[in-house]
């Protein structure tokens, strides 16, 4: 284990107010020390390293120039917030990042006054910032609002909706576009920096104000002519952009790793901006750490690693991951059916669709961070006879729900939805938990909703979805490894709406939807030992329910427990509704529904989170005993 880095200047900075006492000439050293501290911390915890390394100078410059937390600083997504946390009173806890009882991996309002708006999903910063900027104007304060958004997040429609509204409102909002893929335009050295300083200065920014005053004096009829004249003059210096068309004063691109470029531009904007300003800053993801700079993903998300070599610690898997099983099964089906296409919203490796992309690039579509578009794009493909697999994380499917309802479900289009990261996801906490998809999909008429109990079942569900053309169909599966079951050579086509009984009993029935099946089997052993012969069933489907299976369990057992990795309103609610409507609750059946708790659970290891939620074997046994009013001592005997 290496010693912590030597950081004499950074040691003087507890809060941004301390940073403002440091001379400009010493800022590059502070940046080096901050980068070293961040690398060392993430080597211990794992996390999102590359994005933070890319914004070290930018984060320092913003906190030095602006009066945070009075001035509001909002980071989009939040992957890049680790340097910000170190500078805002949280350095002593930085090695608890993403750990149980530790710092969140994202900005979080409850954690610090320097986090005015929480984030984790993309493209929200400009909308939130605009709300805060308008609030400042309504409150007649001089508060500045700065939103930092990456070029990737700009692919989402919400970002452009906010830009359009901000321009129309002429709000005092500063948007910093962090272009870390050089996908928009590279800076052009000293001349670019000079022009950016010039464009952000009082003279050129004043031209816009002159235009506004002339419009007010002479009337709106000549508004467009004045605007064209002002922007034409500015165009000789800065070049016209779409941002200017939306009403923003555009500065840049500038070098996001140069304090000589950043500090004067930010100071000019702070002192002179009267309306919306967009500063285009070019940075390098992974900057300053050779292994990250050399890696294809720039160390976007890493496990713990050796600081010297960059080698990441990866435990040898006991079974293939669910994501890998899905990817391999989809490739297998795609080889046999040229109508199968894959769609991802900027997550090809996370969803496993990169495997399909490598083999069938013409049939794989990465639409960017645009889940709404992804869903309706898939609907269009389905309408023309193709078989789209729109692979999204559960938490991101939420972003396209209206499209699922309006464009897919109402029209009965056979879009396939592989839903990754179902249930608790561990270190990423509540913003990334897959809690709600079962509830919001099972409520839609004509939707088939499945959950895989293990990796073999997942393979069956991929083939089932590929073969199903009657309407939309989904199947959910968690992050992480499978349970190590024997894998079929190819998946089977499952009968729609039919579950299976895994183990027969007579007193207690455990009906599982998803991967809690393994815990149900462990619980059944304990219940059998306690004299409660237990049936274990795998529902497979939340919609349509296996009515015959549920009737059988209800009529021949004293207790029926539904178990799922989702929020209330999902599978268990569907079962209870069916039981009530058929009168199966009228004769003494004790039914309990185990779901994710009705609260936002902070990050921890998934096993710990499920234990706290009562969704492990012990929690299931406890629920059965409580339902039967058994003596608590019996529970202790099974511990």
UniProtKB/Swiss-Prot annotation:
Tell me the enzyme class: transferase
Task: Locate the residues binding thiamine diphosphate.
Answer: 79, 120-122, 152-153, 180, 289, 371
From the UniProt record, list the reaction(s) this protein catalyses.
D-glyceraldehyde 3-phosphate + pyruvate + H(+) = 1-deoxy-D-xylulose 5-phosphate + CO2
**What molecular functions are annotated in GO for this chain?**
1-deoxy-D-xylulose-5-phosphate synthase activity; magnesium ion binding; thiamine pyrophosphate binding
User: What's its EC?
Assistant: 2.2.1.7
Which keywords appear in this protein's UniProt record, sorted alphabetically?
A: Isoprene biosynthesis, Magnesium, Metal-binding, Thiamine biosynthesis, Thiamine pyrophosphate, Transferase
Known cofactor(s)? Mg(2+); thiamine diphosphate
Q: According to its UniProt record, which protein family does this protein belong to?
A: Belongs to the transketolase family. DXPS subfamily.
Q: What does this chain do?
A: Catalyzes the acyloin condensation reaction between C atoms 2 and 3 of pyruvate and glyceraldehyde 3-phosphate to yield 1-deoxy-D-xylulose-5-phosphate (DXP).
Q: Which PANTHER family match?
A: 1-D-DEOXYXYLULOSE 5-PHOSPHATE SYNTHASE-RELATED, 1-DEOXY-D-XYLULOSE-5-PHOSPHATE SYNTHASE, CHLOROPLASTIC
Protein name in the entry:
1-deoxy-D-xylulose-5-phosphate synthase
């Amino acid at each position: 284990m290496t010693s912590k880095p030597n950081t004499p200047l950074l040691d003087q900075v507890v809060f941004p107010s301390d940073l403002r006492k440091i001379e400009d000439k010493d800022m590059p050293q502070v940046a080096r020390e901050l980068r070293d501290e961040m690398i060392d911390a993430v080597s211990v915890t794992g996390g999102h390293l590359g994005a933070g390394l890319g914004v070290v100078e930018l984060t320092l410059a913003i906190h030095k120039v602006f009066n945070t937390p009075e001035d509001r600083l909002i980071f989009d997504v939040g992957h890049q917030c680790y340097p910000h946390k170190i500078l805002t009173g949280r350095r002593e806890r930085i090695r608890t990042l993403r750990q149980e009882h530790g710092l969140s991996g994202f900005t979080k309002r409850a954690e610090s006054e320097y986090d005015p708006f929480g984030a984790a999903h993309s493209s929200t910063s400009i909308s939130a910032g605009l709300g805060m900027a308008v609030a400042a104007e309504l409150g007649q304060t001089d508060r500045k609002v700065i939103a930092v958004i990456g070029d990737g997040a700009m692919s989402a429609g919400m970002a452009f909706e906010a830009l359009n509204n901000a321009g129309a409102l002429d709000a005092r909002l500063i948007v910093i576009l962090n272009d870390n893929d050089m996908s928009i335009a590279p800076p052009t050295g000293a001349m670019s920096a000079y022009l950016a300083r010039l464009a952000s200065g009082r003279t050129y920014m004043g031209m816009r104000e002159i235009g506004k005053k002339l419009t007010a004096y002479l009337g709106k009829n000549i508004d467009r002519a004045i605007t064209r004249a002002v922007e034409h003059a500015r165009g000789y210096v800065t070049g016209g952009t779409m941002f200017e068309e939306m009403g923003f004063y555009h500065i840049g691109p500038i070098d996001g790793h140069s304090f000589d470029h950043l500090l004067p531009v930010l100071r000019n904007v702070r002192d002179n901006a009267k309306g919306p300003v967009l500063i285009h800053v070019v940075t390098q993801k992974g900057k300053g750490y050779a292994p990250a700079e050399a890696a294809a993903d720039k160390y976007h998300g890493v496990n713990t690693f050796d600081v010297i070599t960059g080698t990441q610690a990866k435990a040898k898997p006991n079974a293939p991951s669910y994501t890998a099983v899905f990817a391999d099964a989809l490739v297998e089906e795609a080889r046999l059916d040229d109508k199968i296409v894959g769609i991802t919203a900027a997550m090809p490796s996370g969803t496993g669709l990169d495997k399909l992309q490598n083999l069938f690039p013409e049939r794989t579509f990465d639409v960017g961070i645009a889940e709404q578009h992804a869903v309706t794009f898939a609907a269009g493909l389905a309408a023309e006879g193709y078989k789209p697999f729109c692979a999204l994380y559960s938490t991101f499917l939420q972003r396209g729900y209206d499209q699922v309802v309006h464009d897919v479900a109402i029209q009965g289009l056979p879009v396939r939805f592989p839903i990754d990261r179902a249930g608790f996801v561990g270190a990423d906490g509540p913003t990334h938990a897959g809690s709600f998809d079962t509830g919001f999909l099972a409520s839609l008429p004509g939707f088939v909703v499945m959950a895989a109990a293990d990796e073999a079942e997942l393979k069956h569900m991929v083939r089932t979805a590929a073969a199903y053309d009657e309407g939309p169909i989904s199947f959910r599966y968690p992050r992480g490894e499978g349970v190590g079951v024997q894998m079929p050579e190819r998946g089977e086509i499952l009968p729609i709406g039919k579950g299976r009984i895994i183990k027969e009993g007579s007193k207690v029935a455990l009906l599982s939807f998803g991967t809690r099946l393994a815990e149900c089997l462990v619980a059944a052993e304990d219940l059998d030992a306690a004299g409660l012969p237990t049936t274990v069933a795998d529902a497979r489907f939340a919609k349509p329910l296996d009515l015959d299976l549920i009737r059988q369990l209800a009529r021949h057992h004293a207790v029926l427990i539904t178990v799922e990795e989702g929020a209330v309103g999902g599978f268990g609610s569907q079962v209870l509704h069916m039981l009530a409507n058929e009168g199966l609750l009228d004769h003494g059946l004790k039914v309990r529904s185990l779901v994710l708790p009705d609260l936002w659970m902070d990050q921890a290891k998934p096993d710990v989170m499920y234990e706290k939620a009562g969704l492990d074997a012990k929690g299931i046994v406890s629920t059965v005993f409580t339902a039967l009013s058994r003596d608590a001592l019996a529970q202790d005997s099974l511990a």
